[in-house]
Amino acid sequence: MLSQIYPQAQHPYSFELNKDMHISAAHFIPRESAGACSRVHGHTYTVNITVAGDELDDSGFLVNFSVLKKLVHGNYDHTLLNDHEDFSQDDRYSLPTTEVVAKTIYDNVQAYLDTLENKPTCVQVFVRETPTSYCVYRPKKGGLNG
């Protein structure tokens, strides 16, 4: 069971849900400057997705927890992240760093949420790579990244 305290995103919505999961995945950063991380290695990532909104769907959900798990865990668990199209380009916004993994998860979750009638929004994605290292992605309102 996960029992974490995460940095909180400020938002104006009435409802907020958080979905925790673990993902076991390998990756490498194909840059000399990445040091040891330039070699294939793995992590058991801890991922927390925060979704918020004002309206519930017909089932009384903001979004079904199982769909969030399928979108993330179902896509990345027990894989080499570099093999995914999301991380296959050789540019800084496609390398499977913790920062890019968090933003990519956000992009995928928000794309799904945009299809829902009740229009919830992903306000934060937290990705912990090690016990001492994590990244939080929060989209900027009206910016290119959110």
From Swiss-Prot:
GO terms for molecular function: 6-carboxytetrahydropterin synthase activity; metal ion binding. Keywords: Lyase, Metal-binding, Queuosine biosynthesis, Zinc. It is an enzyme of class 4 (lyase). Binds 1 zinc ion per subunit. The keyword Lyase applies. Pfam families: PTPS (PF01242). It comes from the Bacteria. The active site is at residues 37, 78, 129. Its EC number is 4.1.2.50. Zn(2+) binds at residues 27, 41, 43. Its cofactor is Zn(2+). Pathway: Purine metabolism; 7-cyano-7-deazaguanine biosynthesis. GO terms for biological process: queuosine biosynthetic process. Catalyzes the conversion of 7,8-dihydroneopterin triphosphate (H2NTP) to 6-carboxy-5,6,7,8-tetrahydropterin (CPH4) and acetaldehyde. Belongs to the PTPS family. QueD subfamily. The active site is at the interface between 2 subunits. The proton acceptor Cys is on one subunit, and the charge relay system is on the other subunit. Homotetramer. This is 6-carboxy-5,6,7,8-tetrahydropterin synthase. It comes from Bacillus subtilis (strain 168). The gene is queD.
